[in-house]
Amino acid sequence: MKLKRLTALLLSVMLVLSLAACGGGKDAKDDSADGDLSGKEIIIGNITPVTGAQAAYGLAITNSIQLAIDEINAAGGILGATVKLSTKDDQGTPAEAVSGFNSLLSEGAAAIIGATLSSCTSAITSLADDEGIVLVTPSSTADSITTTDDYVFRSCFKDSFQGEMVAAYAKDQGWTKAAVLYATGDTYSSGLHDSFVKAAEKYGIEIVCEQSSSDTGAVDFSSQLATIAASGAGMLFAPYYYDAVGPKIIPQAREAGFKGAIMGCDGFDGTQDYTTGDLSAYENVYFTNHYSPEDSSEIVQSYVKNYTEKYGSESMNALGALAYDAMYMVKQAIEKAGSIDHEAIRDAMSGMHYVGVTGDMTLDETGTPEKSVAILTFTPSDGKLVQK
């Protein structure tokens, strides 16, 4: 079936919530401590799904890291060293994420960007801490990712933040009764379910119906959605990924007779490429996201322009922007450390203040940035993401 495009508008919600950053450490080899790595090569690892259901994320992430590296090398590298990207395909599975992590260790990576999915990153956080190598995930939003590990950071916000922002937006819109559809076996989906349900109570939103699938790869949600349609809910919170949301959940919800708002989180990014049937089904759909490509700031527009010129606009998404920021965060840390010593890089990451494509952020005790959130909506017309 031919894919259609939707346009997403940035709504007038930019909300900031304080989160937490990082500490601790282990010994790691010191390849240079004098601040000059001229003539050397710095390997940056990248663990992401190059193949599989979430390959669109991996494509944008890999492209964006390479874009950042190309810019860095053109400007003289990091401490005079040339930067090289080594990408490992985790296929969206924890076992392959572990395999990729071990391969990057053997290659002598200075730091690793990854993984993409929370389930995959969860499989390697303890390894990063044990081996003493900085791991920066651009997109794993599960709260548990950065609570205990000394060497683990992220450039994205976390699920408790997204869940609360969804509840706050629902209250602002007057949606007092909500239904939830989520995947019990997926770290991302179940974590967002938990944070939204908790926040809903805080904001006076009644959860009138909860339905679930065992994982995010389900095909038929019609039974659950029929129950939701009959529940009297004015909104449906469905924290799934774009490949389930676009061709399955949204059209099946409308076919079941659900006419209310449908909300999700950053996993909805990419839905515009996975639509099917009547595009009017995608009206009244909203999701939290990390940035808008229509933000007029110079840093955002420079990224959008450079990415589009190099790779085209079709593969660009928010996770790519987060990965671009993650690469520049690693650069900033290595330059501050004056070395590619792993512990020194970790120390330089802790408490970092960084201004990037996805916002002005500061890391604190759990390695998670304090930053703003955008809420986007779809409108059925040809075009691109535009800011309202």
Question: Where do the model's predicted regions map?
Answer:
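Extracytoplasmic "Venus flytrap"
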Residues: 36-38, 42-66, 88-94, 117-119, ...
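An alpha-beta-alpha
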Residues: 152-212, 235
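Extracellular/periplasmic bilobed ligand-binding domains
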Residues: 177, 193-288
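Segments of small-molecule ligand-sensing domains
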Residues: 309-317, 331-382
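Hydrophobic alpha-helical segments within soluble ligand-binding/sensing domains
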Residues: 97, 155-177, 190-192, 218-222, ...
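Extracellular/periplasmic periplasmic-binding protein-like sensory domains
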Residues: 250-324, 378-379, 384-387
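Short, low-complexity disordered leader/linker segments with a strong preference
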Residues: 1-43, 74, 106, 387-388
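Beta-alpha junction/loop-to-helix N-cap segments that form part of ligand/metal-binding clefts
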Residues: 26-31, 56-63, 75-144, 213-221, ...
